[in-house]
């Protein structure tokens, strides 16, 4: 009985590991399909800058998706319309994955993502794993948030 339980634990662990590796590979492929990836960071004004940059890229003829966070959490679609995406779920930096996949599947030329991470480790993960920006914008760095940027 112990061997069966041990075997089940090992098999389940292997399955979870394989799923994680596959998810990372699929996410990286989706990121590579989007040539321009902008991440907006800072202490104030991130949502406004995200919206402005996305509008400018759309105006330049690029198929652009954008994602804002906070009180105005929305996906901004290539036609400029908005789609609420969180709907009472807790905030999580992993929410970049479905956004990037959908934008890539739609043939996006660019994405503009408002950085939602507060802690340094999550900021690193946003940049290095979830967005891999080709352009980073820092709106400002005020003293009340300086340790988090």
Locations of regions flagged by a protein language model:
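Short, basic phosphate-binding NTP loop
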Residues: 1-41, 48-60
């Amino acid at each position: 009985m112990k061997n069966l339980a041990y075997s089940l634990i090992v098999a389940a662990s292997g399955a979870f590991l394989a799923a994680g590796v596959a998810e990372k590979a699929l996410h990286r492929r989706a990121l590579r399909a989007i040539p321009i990836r902008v991440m907006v960071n800072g202490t104030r004004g991130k949502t406004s800058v995200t919206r402005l940059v996305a509008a400018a890229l759309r105006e330049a003829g690029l198929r652009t998706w954008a994602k804002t966070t906070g009180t105005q959490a929305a996906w901004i679609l290539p036609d400029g319309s908005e789609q609420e995406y969180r709907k009472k779920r807790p905030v999580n930096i992993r929410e970049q994955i479905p956004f990037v996949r959908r934008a890539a599947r739609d043939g996006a030329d660019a994405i503009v993502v408002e950085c939602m991470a507060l802690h340094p480790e999550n900021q690193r993960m946003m940049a290095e794993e979830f967005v891999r920006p080709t352009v980073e914008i820092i709106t400002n760095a005020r003293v009340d948030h300086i340790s988090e940027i």
